[in-house]
């Protein structure tokens, strides 16, 4: 927990360190003192000389926990990724939601891909990436009837989307997870020199456009014959009621979950203004669900557009104040093995990874006047990152200027390399936007 030293604002500080504690609960070590552990999907006993981990809630953690572990605890992150690759070697599949050596198949998607790729793209590479890629490609290309991770892969590969075949089959949610996984897989394929694969998976990742319905301005389930599902209510699914096409949410919770192509989604919606107005409406009308992973990065999407970053800064501060407290109800819901807490950690420090695999963070106004991050010099030679905020009053929540290592940022993003080599990240804040 002492990797980050924050300011003296007592209540906020306690919430921050509580979130850090939550981050580190899972995954947890499973091997015994002699190195023995239960092998994946087997009655056999394996042996390790390192650390073997368990409890992989990957549908949640690929969104932000992977990035934070790579930044703060790279050595542990390496052991976690090596464990995931060993699980593939033992069972034939990368994990989706592993629990003590068993695959629960909870939630959807192919989340090991973005979890590992994000770490790889950020420079963490001391593991067998070719075997990892083999496992990723298997999940992405195996026909559905033989595919543990993507049971509806036949439709996805042939049509570019997953049609709704049963009333509550979560088809749109499945496809959206495949799109972000395939986009990440295209990044890795490109990095490994597998150009044809990179092209294939990059094209697949754009399939979300099939679901966009101009009539409602949201994503909408598609039937096997290619027509949109009817009758359709984009609000159906509120409060976890069943919803055709969507898992634990509704169309508004999922429509903006195309983190790898936000500008493309905005173009579908009719341009920047319509995108921003629609996204703002999600917050104004209470459609946003802080406890639902697919939309937790929504506040940061405004910053992709010129002149709109103030909305990010305002909303993030409001959400932190509303949902995170040093009290029994101090979380927006199930912490999902650190995912909700990680949102708070990043947001309090002043930067957030809005898209897994993308090396840029979106910046926002930090909660603290000073944060010191102790970076592992084995991985980040600079050794320390100090985040400072210059403000006159607590109402100064809007960014006037950000400098990294004395150099002014041109926009509202900072790359991984800029961040870890900055030494000092300094925010000048004001009370107007």
Task: Go through each PLM region and give its residues.
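Single conserved hydrophobic/aromatic residue that forms the stacking wall/gate
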Residues: 1-7, 12
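Structured loops at beta-to-helix junctions and adjacent beta-edge loops in soluble globular domains
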Residues: 22, 26, 119, 301, ...
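Detector for glycine-centered tight turns/loop "hinges" at secondary-structure junctions
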Residues: 35, 91-93, 217, 226, ...
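Active-site core of glycosidic bond-cleaving carbohydrate-active enzymes
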Residues: 48-63, 71-73, 113, 123-381, ...
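C-terminal beta-sandwich/jelly-roll accessory domains of carbohydrate-active enzymes
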Residues: 391-433
């Amino acid at each position: 927990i002492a990797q980050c030293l924050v300011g003296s604002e007592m209540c906020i500080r306690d919430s921050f360190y509580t979130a850090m504690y939550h981050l580190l609960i899972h995954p947890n070590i499973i091997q015994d003192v002699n190195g023995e552990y239960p092998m994946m999907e087997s009655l056999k006993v394996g042996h390790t000389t390192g650390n073997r981990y368990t409890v992989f809630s990957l549908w949640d953690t690929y969104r932000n926990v992977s990035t934070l572990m790579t930044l703060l605890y790279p050595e542990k992150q390496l052991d976690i990724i090596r464990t995931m690759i060993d699980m593939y070697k033992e069972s034939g599949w990368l994990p989706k939601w592993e629990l003590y050596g068993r695959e629960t198949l909870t939630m959807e998607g192919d989340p090991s891909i973005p979890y590992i790729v994000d770490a790889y793209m950020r420079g963490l590479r001391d593991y067998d990436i070719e075997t990892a890629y083999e496992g990723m490609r298997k999940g992405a290309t195996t026909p559905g009837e033989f595919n543990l991770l993507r049971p509806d892969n036949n439709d996805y590969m042939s049509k570019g989307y997953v049609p709704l075949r049963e009333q509550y089959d979560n088809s749109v949610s499945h496809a959206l997870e495949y799109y972000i996984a395939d986009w990440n897989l295209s990044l890795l394929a490109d990095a490994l020199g597998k150009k044809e694969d990179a092209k294939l998976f990059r094209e697949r990742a754009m399939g979300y456009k099939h679901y966009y319905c101009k009539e409602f301005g949201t994503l909408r389930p598609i039937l096997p014959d290619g027509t949109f599902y009817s009758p359709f209510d984009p609000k159906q699914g509120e409060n976890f009621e069943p919803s055709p096409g969507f898992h634990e949410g509704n169309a508004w919770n999922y429509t903006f979950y195309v983190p790898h192509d936000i500008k493309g989604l905005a173009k579908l919606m009719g341009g920047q203004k319509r995108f921003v107005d629609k996204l703002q409406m999600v917050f104004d009308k209470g459609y946003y669900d802080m406890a639902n992973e697919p939309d937790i990065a929504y506040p940061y999407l405004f910053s992709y557009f010129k002149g709109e970053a103030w909305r990010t800064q305002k909303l993030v501060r409001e959400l932190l104040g509303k949902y995170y407290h040093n009290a029994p109800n101090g979380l927006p819901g199930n912490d999902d093995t650190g995912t909700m807490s990680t949102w708070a950690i990043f947001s309090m420090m002043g930067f957030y990874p809005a898209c897994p695999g993308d090396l840029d963070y979106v910046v926002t106004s930090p909660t603290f006047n000073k944060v010191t991050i102790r970076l592992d010099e084995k991985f980040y030679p600079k050794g320390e990152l100090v985040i400072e905020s210059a403000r006159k009053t607590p109402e100064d929540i809007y960014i006037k200027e950000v400098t990294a290592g004395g150099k002014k940022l041109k926009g509202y993003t900072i790359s991984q390399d800029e961040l870890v080599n900055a030494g000092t990240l300094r925010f000048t804040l004001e009370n107007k936007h």
